Amino acid sequence: MTERFQGRLADVIRRPLITEKATRALEINQYTFEVDHRAAKPDIKAAIEQLFDVKVTGISTMNPPRRSRRMGRFAGKRAQVKKAVVRLAEGNSIQLFPES
């Protein structure tokens, strides 16, 4: 685990990503999260295992390019994000949707 997130693992994970592709991946025990762009794979693994009490078997990360945004004549960039696809061990799961 890197020094940046020492003792602050809850700051690593921003939110789960719920898309059609991510929902299909739930069937094969893969969960997609938006994480801090400075987080390394060991940070993400430690945060997921500690927050959700599961065993992580693999992580794939991707850094999509920043998107430009305009507000009138002013141009800017959206915040940098990193996506992490987390594979869990057999028998583990994360409750993303409330039971109705």
Swiss-Prot record:
Record GO terms (molecular function): rRNA binding; structural constituent of ribosome
Keywords assigned: Ribonucleoprotein, Ribosomal protein, RNA-binding, rRNA-binding
Record flagged with keyword RNA-binding: yes
Similarity comment text for this entry: Belongs to the universal ribosomal protein uL23 family.
Entry function: One of the early assembly proteins it binds 23S rRNA. One of the proteins that surrounds the polypeptide exit tunnel on the outside of the ribosome. Forms the main docking site for trigger factor binding to the ribosome.
PANTHER family with a match to the protein in the record: 60S RIBOSOMAL PROTEIN L23A
Subunit structure, interactors included: Part of the 50S ribosomal subunit. Contacts protein L29, and trigger factor when it is bound to the ribosome.
This protein's name: Large ribosomal subunit protein uL23
Annotated organism of origin: Synechococcus sp. (strain CC9605)
Gene that specifies this protein: rplW
